[in-house]
Amino acid sequence: MTTRFTHFRRAAAGLAASSVLLLGTLTPQATAADTGTAPPPVLTGAQLAASWTAPLSTRDRYVVDANGDRFKLKSGNWAGAQGTWQGSGDVGDVANHQARQMSHNIPLGLDRKPIADILADFHALGLNSIRLPFANAMIRDTSVVPDSAVAANPQLKGKTPLQVLDAVVAAMTTDGFAVILNNHTTSYRFCCGLDGNERWNSGQSTQQWIDDWVFLAKRYKDDKRVVGADLRNEVRRDTWNDPNWGWGNDHDLNKAMEEAGNKILQAVPDLLVIMEGINWQGIPTDLTPHGRPTLTPVATLSNTLIRSDKLVYAAHFYGYTGPNHTGATGTGETHDPRYEEFTPAQLAQVVDDQALFVTRSGQHFTAPVWISEFGAGGRGEIDAKERAWFTNFTDILVRNDTDFAIWPLVGWTDANGTPQDTWAMVNYSANGARLGVMDAGDWRTTDWNKLVGAPGRTGRIAPAPRWNMLNLDYADYNVSATMLAKPDWSPGNRKGNCPDTQRLVGLGRSDSRGLCTDAGQPAKASGPWTVVTDERYVSGGDWASGYDKRQCPDGSFAVGYSVRGNAMSALLCAPATASLPTTGRVLWFDKADNRPATGGSTASDWAPGHYKGQCADTEYVAGVAFTWKWNHGGVPDALLCRPLG
């Protein structure tokens, strides 16, 4: 589901499809000879369950299971619980629902097919995980779904939408699937543009949104195969305001996702936290600035969570949209290129620029990227550009070994056997007959089999060092679980604390940003951490003559700092279990960047426009020097870097 302002192409594609299949007719399954690509191996639920161990986490650019083995997200979107009503007309009239499919605010298809059979079809597609969209409205919806909405699953009669979701989640995880919950909308409305669901705080407060997430996280915490929280779908401009990434206000998606992710992890530490970038900014005319930032802002402002092994970034791509194109036809359309109009090489470059760059190792932003929505119309799709785009895009996913989720999984066929939403991977008739991408006659089969069966990295993923940034631009940035449980350690100042598994390794000058790492991380002792507000711990001589200094006690290393304005205030130090060297070097960055030539996050900028000082990966920060002389304003000018051993 992607932002568009007028023309909903995916729904229209479903209406344009033609088919001679009769209601209830079973269709032959596609073969390798039909497609040129062998279909994926079909695992039973027991086989899928045995193939991975929950919970999931991340190492470098990969999602891994509890054993450290690669778990590539081969996913699909089972839509419906986010609502299908299109916002006008009688909500009880199926004609007013997306592709004339009324979900009754539960996953589509439960009226037509037993859930076990639906999941068997998901297995046949080669999936191992399901993205499950929902609306915040579902959480407080006490209405009972009509019996007709669960006709093929009578065990679900008499349940509310949330209770139906409970049963669906339990069925999926029992059958071996990993489940990722996706907050798709606030209200039960489909879909996009100016629909009242533009931001996480559209129609609700940010606090309510976070509370809802914590509620759901706790609801499913005992089911370890509920593996992730996909925080919000396609954040975009509303009538008056753009979302932003890092302004510190109520429209700041970076700030909101940071807060929500940490609250979720405090409640349920096992979950992956999935953050999608900004889907649209600006007014789409040829005379006004506009565009689709996606993950590009992450290059200079990434997120750091209290569990640094839990962050996954996400992005959406559809052929009829573009980096600066809404996907609209008519009102809201500009003359910017659509993704489907790029050459294969151009498309690969723009997808890397907008999203896949995040998978580069050793940077402050390094994380897995999940393309959590993409797709194309199947049967009846005659647009050559659309078809070529799908082939080219799936080629990109294969080459980059990228995690993915196709949109959508389930749709309906009408009384003539014609798919109502040709984008769906499987469509069911009223009596449950299936017409899917695994059946003959769908042009997407070759590309789908190519994608889901592509070779990629498997087996154990070795732990890799991490670098994560701290952003004190507007407020505290406390991602230490230890310090979050303690009183304010530097009242009246903005504070930045590294995750408990990391230490401070760099500071920005005049912008209050910091860099943390776990490269060569010394073990922390169990003793108290020290807040340094003066020079009482300075040792080894006056290493920055004429400058004020904050230095950790010998045997400890910096894990946090505080500032007033951008001026240095205090240093937070944690004790090491083993002795640390007390010799070192002074690293000045008052006149230029002073960063290692090689090593962590040296190819990325975590404090753009400001000088940065960064100790080597084999060092720890033992002290910071600053001065109020010469109009320096008390900002950090030098680091005392000491070797780890």
Q: Predicted segment positions?
A:
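Aromatic-rich peripheral "rim/lid" segments of glycoside hydrolase catalytic domains that contact
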Residues: 380-473
